[in-house]
């Protein structure tokens, strides 16, 4: 029932503030700039931040970014080392790095034992722990917002980790009593979640409890805690699982690469990044009972008028039970030698409504149900297209994931309960940009093609300045 006590590693904990954080997002202009595989900067179609690795010192308020990540995972997953590596890497780039201590470890090291508490006392302690976590994080978040430098805030576990150590009924009661909701606690509070898989799952020879005073789990319990902590974050739009399929050094590099990729920082081959987005066509979905635990979201995409053929912009509205998050994505190819950059900005509802005036009439609005789930240490997003929309989207279901695996290793981690028709990675026929076009593909000049995938080889090459939608991330 404890909250994230299994790994006393230092990284920043993120969590949501009771109602106040949500109100702040509604009332203030959003100042968090994020560049993720699709994340960062201003929603203005023409503005693009510099992403040079050697940017040092202060930055202009317009370009400044405050990026909040959660390091989570099972016991002996590498969070302490990972936090240190992230800190060193980003400080070398000139960023200010804040490290929020793990609240559970701080409180439990003061003599608290759950075995000594009554059920009522344990519930109240857990609730106060989360409130404390929220306040500690808010202190660091405000420091990040007031700094004149780009800031990375590393949270050693976040609020949703607490749900792994408490019953569903008690968790929902606690959320309702504090005016919390999953969209604010899980999706809007943090920019990215990094789950470092426990050594007990895939690297058993290296599993140890010797270096942590609050850790005593055996291998089987460590595996269980690892799964629970990952399941707690299913549904976050930018959730990366860093498994033990490589040696530890490469695992750390993959973690750093994941953050850099989502921030839009060009690292070249410094970390030998191999992870890539994969997309699959799926037919005839099975009953919900065949899925592992999942989170469903309503998602709405609007393409916007852009400043030119090299720029593409869109809005995304994503939510559950009438709680929403809003993201603006601006995409430009060939920035500072990078193949593609997607700049994402978290928006307030007011900013979102204002930007809707820039909708591109050449595109349908895209409506989806998005199902997020975790299986075989792999995070998947299943997009089920809904009406209204173009007839070409009727019944369309696409599965997406990010992986560095290939061959049989990749095949073995895919969900066996889904009827996967074929891989469509890079196929422009399944690009959201093309799927949303109102004009017929055979006559429109807006259809974007690629000469790198299957049947596209028979088509004319892409003009040099044209946006490549098959590289896009569907948010």
Curated annotation (Swiss-Prot):
The keyword Nucleotide-binding applies. InterPro entries: CYTH-like_dom_sf, NadR/Ttd14_AAA_dom, P-loop_NTPase, TRPL-trafficking_regulator. Gene3D superfamilies: Hypothetical Protein Pfu-838710-001, P-loop containing nucleotide triphosphate hydrolases. One of its GO terms (biological process) is photoreceptor cell maintenance. Residues 1-59, 452-475 are annotated as: Disordered. Its main location: cytoplasm. Residues 1-19 have a biased composition (Polar residues). GO terms for molecular function: GTP binding; phosphatidic acid binding; phosphatidylinositol binding. One of its GO terms (cellular component) is cytosol. It is found in: Cytoplasm, Cytosol. Keywords: Cytoplasm, GTP-binding, Lipid-binding, Nucleotide-binding, Protein transport, Transport. Isoform A: Expressed in the head. Isoform B: Expressed in the head. It comes from the Eukaryota. GTP-binding protein which is required for the light-dependent internalization of the TRPL ion channel from the rhabdomere on the apical surface of photoreceptor cells to the cell body and for the recycling of TRPL back to the rhabdomere in the dark. Binds to 3-phosphoinositide (PtdIns(3)P) and phosphatic acid and so may interact with membranes, particularly the early endosome membrane where PtdIns(3)P is predominantly localized. Plays a role in preventing photoreceptor degeneration. This is TRPL translocation defect protein 14. It comes from Drosophila melanogaster. The gene is Ttd14.
């Amino acid at each position: 029932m404890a909250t994230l006590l299994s790994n006393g590693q230092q990284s920043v904990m993120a969590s949501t503030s009771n109602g106040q954080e949500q109100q702040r997002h509604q009332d203030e202009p959003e100042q968090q700039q994020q560049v993720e595989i699709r994340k960062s900067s201003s929603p203005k179609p023409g503005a693009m931040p510099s992403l040079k690795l050697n940017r040092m010192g202060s930055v202009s308020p317009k370009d400044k970014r405050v990026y909040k990540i959660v390091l989570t995972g099972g016991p002996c997953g590498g969070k302490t080392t990972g936090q240190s590596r992230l800190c060193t890497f980003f400080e070398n780039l000139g960023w200010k790095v804040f490290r929020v201590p793990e609240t559970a470890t701080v409180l439990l090291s003061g003599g608290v034992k759950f075995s000594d508490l009554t059920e009522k006392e344990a519930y109240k302690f857990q609730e106060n722990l989360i409130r404390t976590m929220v306040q500690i994080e808010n202190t660091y978040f405000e420091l990040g917002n007031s700094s004149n430098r780009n800031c990375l805030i590393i949270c050693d576990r976040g609020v949703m980790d607490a749900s792994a150590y408490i019953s569903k009924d008690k968790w929902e009661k606690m959320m309702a009593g504090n005016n919390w909701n999953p969209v604010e606690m899980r999706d809007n509070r943090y920019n990215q979640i990094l789950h470092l898989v426990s050594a007990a799952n895939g690297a058993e020879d290296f599993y140890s409890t010797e270096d942590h005073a609050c850790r005593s789990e055996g291998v089987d319990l460590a595996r269980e805690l690892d799964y629970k902590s990952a399941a707690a974050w299913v549904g976050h739009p930018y959730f990366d699982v860093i498994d033990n399929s490589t040696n530890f050094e490469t695992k750390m590099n993959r973690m750093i690469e994941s953050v850099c990729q989502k921030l839009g920082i060009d690292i070249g081959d410094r970390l030998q990044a191999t992870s890539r987005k994969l997309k699959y066509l799926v037919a005839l979905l099975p009953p919900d009972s065949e899925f592992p635990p999942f989170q469903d979201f309503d998602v709405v995409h609007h393409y916007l008028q852009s400043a030119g053929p090299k720029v593409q912009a869109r809005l995304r509205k994503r939510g559950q039970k009438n709680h929403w998050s809003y993201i603006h994505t601006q995409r430009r190819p060939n920035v500072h030698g990078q193949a593609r950059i997607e700049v994402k900005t978290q928006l307030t509802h007011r900013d979102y409504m204002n930007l809707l005036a820039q909708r591109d009439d050449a595109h349908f609005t895209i409506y989806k149900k998005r199902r997020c789930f975790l299986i075989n240490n792999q995070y998947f997003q299943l997009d089920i297209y809904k009406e209204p929309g173009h007839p070409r989207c009727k019944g369309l279901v696409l599965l997406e994931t990010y992986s560095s695996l290939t061959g049989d290793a990749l095949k073995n981690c895919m969900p066996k309960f889904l009827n996967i028709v074929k891989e469509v990675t890079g196929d422009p026929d399944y690009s959201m940009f093309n799927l949303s076009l109102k004009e017929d593909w055979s006559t429109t000049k807006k259809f974007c093609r690629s000469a790198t995938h299957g049947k596209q080889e028979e088509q004319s090459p892409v003009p040099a300045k044209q946006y490549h939608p098959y590289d896009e991330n569907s948010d």
